[in-house]
Regions:
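Alpha-helical membrane-anchoring segments
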Residues: 1-374
Length: 374
């Protein structure tokens, strides 16, 4: 091969790669990625936060309200120490009040917004308001926050940019009803041409895809960093980490079950190694079309085990919600068809089978028919 031929081949390869990159970039501006996963994340996040607020309502005053030991003076000192006493200090101090009425008004609003986000009513506006209050609750309870609180804050942050109301929402039902009635969707702005509308659609798609990419990246960072921290610990390297965890009373939901797991050392060691390797390999395996479901099932089992055996149900649930970002649209469509089939099966009644006519009666009927024709 001559130098000229090699250069021509290289230019052709570079041109093909450039065209492929351009086509991918164009697709990312035209096609929203994983819209059903976005809807599932919206439902999961809104539902979990609603459960969280309702469950903690009996302790809300001590956690975030006027009765909290984290008083207003201590809160202000903490803001200054962390450098948060800037332009957004009013936002962070939203729940810092001596009035029980004001606090419970914000609390009730948070409950309502969580329910509306889960149902998908005016999703764009509600997602922003929901995120606004989640930040306020997180900062107010910064001395007692957990992994669940941090992940809910991060996902609420990313969900602001995601078009999560296109499926399984009241917004989607309203649009479908308008389409059935033949009412075309009109722009809310007076001077809004076709080119501007196309630009708006592409910008919305870019923001949606960016938000979903950030959720996926966040989940991979969580698993990757968790694996890196685990392998630095001696108990994880020798397989005894789960044994000591099961023997810790603060993380024992069912003491008998925890004792059974701890009594089977080989099983506990195997589960410890599976946990480390699955978290370490997750970022690579989750993009393989065939191995994706295997690693997601392993992570699902891991989270269920954490929620049941370690008394961390909310943390396990929010991590499962984050894993939903990796499920493709084909999975959700197949699941929807399966649900519709399961719902329609009990409603279908078997048709009543008519008994076959007797031979004598059939012969009499034929004779009568012949006689009438004669």
């Amino acid at each position: 091969m001559t130098v000229r031929a090699a250069l021509a081949l290289g230019l052709d390869s570079a041109g093909g790669l450039g065209r492929q990159v351009a086509a991918t970039a164009r697709k990312l501006t035209l096609q929203p990625l994983a819209p059903y996963s976005a809807a599932a994340i919206r439902i999961g996040l809104g539902g979990l936060y609603l459960i969280h607020l309702l469950r903690e309502s009996v302790r809300a005053d001590r956690l975030w309200g006027p009765g909290s030991p984290f008083t207003a003076d201590l809160f202000d000192q903490t803001l200054k120490a962390r450098g948060w006493d800037g332009a957004f200090s009013w936002w962070y101090s939203l729940l810092v009040t001596d009035s029980a009425l004001v606090f419970w008004a914000w609390y009730a609003l948070a409950v309502v917004l969580s329910a509306l986000l889960m149902l998908g009513w005016r999703t764009r506006v509600v997602a922003v308001l929901f995120w606004f209050l989640v930040v306020a609750f997180y900062v107010r309870g910064s001395m007692a926050n957990s992994g669940w609180a941090l992940l809910s804050l991060l996902f609420a942050n990313y969900l602001v940019f995601v078009a999560s109301g296109r499926h399984w929402s009241l917004d989607a039902r309203r649009r479908a009803r308008r389409a059935e009635e033949g009412k075309a969707a009109r722009s809310k702005f007076v001077f809004w041409g076709e080119e501007t509308e196309e630009l708006r659609r592409r910008l919305v798609t870019i923001l949606h895809n960016g938000g979903m990419a950030m959720i996926a990246l966040q989940v991979m960072v969580i698993y990757g960093s968790a694996a890196m921290y685990k392998i630095q610990g001696e108990s994880w390297r020798n397989g005894t980490a789960l044994y000591y965890t099961m023997m810790y009373d603060d993380f024992s939901t069912f003491p008998e079950l925890s004792a059974w797991v701890a009594s089977h050392g080989t099983f506990a060691a195997l589960m410890a190694y599976v946990t480390v390797f699955s978290q370490m390999l997750f970022p690579a395996l989750v993009f393989n079309r065939r191995l994706k479901y295997c690693i997601l099932v392993v992570m699902l089992a891991t989270h269920i085990g954490i929620g049941v055996l370690m008394a961390l149900p909310m943390f396990s649930a929010i991590t499962i919600v984050g894993d939903l970002v990796f499920l493709p649209t084909t999975f959700w469509l197949a699941a929807s068809r399966l649900v519709r089939t399961a719902r329609a099966a009990p409603e279908e009644k078997p048709e009543a089978s008519l008994p076959p006519p007797r031979e004598g009666a059939d012969g009499q009927a034929k004779g009568a028919e012949v006689g009438s024709s004669a």
